[in-house]
Amino acid sequence: MEQKMTNNHITIGILAHVDAGKTTLSEAMLYSTGQIRSLGRVDHQDAYLDNDAQERERGITIFSKQARLDISRGTNAADTARTADVARTADTARTWHVVMLDTPGHVDFSAEMERTLQVLDYAILVISATDGVQGHTRTLWRLLKHYNVPTFIFVNKMDMQGTDAEKVQAEL
């Protein structure tokens, strides 16, 4: 773990069950770090990382995609977005080079997702507050534990009508 903290190259995977908002989170991370100029949306078929024709047509991630986020240390996301060009040329000791892997959430593409687990330094497990913890979520958790991947849990869609925060917390 200490080696990960001193290394400025990190690989993070974003994993979730289908429709949890994984690609939306990826888009927000890309946008807030200045890597893309506008937010894409799955339902508008313009998500940056879902660029395969089948993915756009079906509205799901089929193939794992990667994007690089260069984040200057000691700045917040808004500062990073405004200084994205500076961050790319900044002293590498002051910049985190994060490779973000957006993985498929549909169970039919689990093999594609599982290939990425062995290279992850960290994972973000996205859970939809409207759907709660799904069977696929439990499978992902077991796989992350098996590969000893430190994991952040991100509960998405908390602002949606009908969300029961206490129920989701109990499921977690």
Describe the residue ranges of each PLM region.
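GTPase G-domain guanine-specificity segment
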Residues: K157-L172
